[in-house]
Amino acid sequence: VNVQLLQEAAVREFVDILDCCEGAKAIIWDESLGGPVGLVARYTFLKEHHVTKMYPLRPEPWTEIDVKNIIFITRPNQLLMDYIAANIHAEEKKKKVSRKEYFLYFLPKKSFLCEKRLQVKGVHGSLSVIGEFRCDFFPFDNDLLSMELKDAYKELYIEGDTSCLHQSACALIGLQKLYGRIPKVYGKGSYAQRVWDITKALAEEDSEALNNDKGVIDQMIIIDRSVDLMSVLATQLTYEGLIDEIYGINNTTVNLPAEKFNTSEGLSTDRNTEKSQFILNSKEQLFAELRDKNFNAVGVVLSRHAKSIKSRANEKHSDMSIQELKKLVEGLPHIKAKEQSLSTHTTIAELVKNVISSDDFLDELGCEQEFMMCSDVDKPNSFIEDLIAKEAPLRSVLRLMCMQSIAGSGLKPKVLDYYKRELVQVYGLQTLLTIGNLEKAGLLRAQTGQRTYHVLRKTLNLTAETPEEVSPKDITYVHSIYAPLSVRIVEQHLKPNGWQMLTEKLSSLPGPTFEDFQSSASLSTRRGSFTSEISQSDIPRVIVVFFVGGCTFAEISALRFLSQQEDNNVEFVICTTKLVNKNTFLDTFIEN
């Protein structure tokens, strides 16, 4: 699938927005959008379209905007409407010669409630245009698309706000408009089913989406995050996953301590924060090779590259022909870039190693791996008790409690009450609000009869007794001994009659297991099995895997690992509402 098409469509939309007004203009962004939209349009592109200033949208108005045209680009959020109103009122109060013009674009869709709010605030009439910036998916890499809806899971489970399901459905319609109709759709979980039902309803209203002939995508698997909560809480042990958990990767960029790098390394260095910024994506050859490896395999790759560069440097140049010398000189910038890349990733690997070789990290990892193996899940865990006694960061304690709860299909009521008492005593009464959120989200609960995780661990081989990290034969390598259930579902589906067999195995998990076939208007699709179809062609099948509620880099690495196995003959396009890790996922539930 050519992800470039998606980027080009978003750029066309953006050009229309920027050309809505003549001359110099300022953009005031919803802060959550600046980074993702930067993946679609670089700064030079904005300059070409006469954008002279960019500001984040904040409660206190900007005072120094000296251009005539002000464009607001925002998510449909009522609080942000108050910020827009404050900015417009502040501008209108100034004594100036020329009036300013205001334009508002909602990403991805307008909202009736937001427009109403602007009327109440008395600024609706001041806006020359209220439009839409239709960009549902942001392209993070050539196989990875994210909607960047950071609170989707929380909105669904805590706030009962299902607007992200409608947005997901719109994104899937947009995908089919670009790449053609997806003939086969499979899914697991209530919200996965809801997203698909809304998508079908929208397709019926929109003939352009429905009449498409089958495109380049063969099928789609929609996975509701609530089906597999263990994988989102587990520590990722891949190179990219660890960088994300320790330093945070946002819109493919990571900020690292500047003093560890040469001044020439990285995109930029911020003197105030003393951070150097790096872009991490598959355009950099070495990172593409490292990103999906277990961290214990990273050293081997780095040392191989170092030897290769050294041997190139030691080649004798005296007996080369002029033609060979010319070739050598032309290749010098490429060699220099390789050396730079090797130096950067060797330093990043050292930074990561310092963290993961600490006792704190290893002790916590040991505790979570015991839970993955279902050992001692029915009684208070002594490591968790020690963490509480030491007043360790609340998030670390809650994560392990939630993992114990998932492994035991709930905590025994006595154990749950005991943990609650201990937490309140040490961290204060407000932790009860957080615990309430975790209970609503399905992360913490009292035990019921059925041991779901325990059974699935056996039937789907979710854990390995001995880790295979350097030359893995199974997806367990991404967490050392644990295979993400979400990806195991995809892997099982690739087998003959895989979905039928899965339907039975997954019956104990919440929500329906469904399959659907979209025939084109002119031709009904044969319900043939996926595998019989695959054998007729050597072209890899393209499968979209869509996570409703977020997915981790470890899950992405596991899917890439599956696509590299020759027997599977598939290519995955991974779509998600948000890229998450154990920290960012839990933070949405913690009440400060």
PLM regions with names:
Residues V1-N592:
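Extended, well-folded catalytic/binding cores that form a central cleft or groove in large enzyme
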